[in-house]
């Protein structure tokens, strides 16, 4: 149990997808203008990561040498299968949001289908394969990585909303000041890097 708790804390704070590895920055910067939209996208990322990392762990275990047929190693197919599983989960999420939460579906716009190619999603799945997590570890890691990404985007959206009322220099208005805020947040998250769990 202690191992899973440390893996969860590590994936949320120490190895934050957005602020430590700088993965998923396209949607991270583009959708961080309003807290409500950022929260909705964060929940979507938690859903996709929480399901795609364990699902891909199961698929990856079937691709390993001798898993299906003795002497057959299908690990060269891992990237294409990872992308297929992620794309299927994003399509399910997109249909669900379109049917039951149309306001969020419209607010996210093009960024919802872009979760399919969000490098934070693929990065978490790749880290799972590289670190050879078991099924339980992949569930904890996927949920923790999604929660960490959501924490970062909601915090940045809150800062961005407050900066609307600030007197930023003309050349830094918009994405410029957002990059600076994200950089300062990343520096703050670097303080967690010294923690060994």
UniProtKB/Swiss-Prot annotation:
Keyword flag Membrane: yes
Superkingdom to which the source organism belongs: Bacteria
rRNA-binding recorded as keyword: no
Location relative to the cell: Cell inner membrane
Primary localization class, coarse: membrane
Description of how the protein assembles with itself and partners: Composed of six subunits; NqrA, NqrB, NqrC, NqrD, NqrE and NqrF.
Protein name: Na(+)-translocating NADH-quinone reductase subunit E
The species this protein was found in: Neisseria meningitidis serogroup A / serotype 4A (strain DSM 15465 / Z2491)
């Amino acid at each position: 149990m202690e191992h899973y708790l440390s893996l969860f804390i590590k994936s949320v704070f120490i190895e934050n997808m957005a602020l430590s590895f700088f993965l998923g920055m396209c949607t991270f910067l583009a959708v961080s203008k309003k807290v409500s939209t950022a929260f909705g996208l964060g929940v979507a990322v938690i859903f996709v990561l929480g399901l795609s990392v364990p699902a891909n762990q199961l698929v990856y275990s079937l691709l390993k040498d001798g898993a299906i047929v003795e002497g057959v190693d299908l690990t060269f197919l891992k990237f294409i299968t990872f992308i297929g599983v992620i794309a299927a989960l994003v399509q399910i999420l997109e249909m669900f949001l379109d049917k039951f939460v149309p306001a969020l579906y419209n607010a996210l716009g093009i960024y919802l289908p872009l979760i399919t190619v969000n490098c934070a999603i693929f990065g978490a799945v790749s880290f799972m394969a590289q670190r050879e997590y078991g099924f339980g570890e992949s569930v904890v890691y996927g949920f923790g990585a999604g929660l960490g990404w959501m924490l970062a985007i909601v915090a940045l959206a809150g800062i961005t909303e407050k900066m609307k009322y600030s007197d930023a220099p003309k050349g830094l208005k918009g994405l410029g000041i957002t990059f600076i805020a994200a950089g300062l947040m990343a520096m703050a998250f670097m303080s967690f890097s010294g923690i060994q769990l």
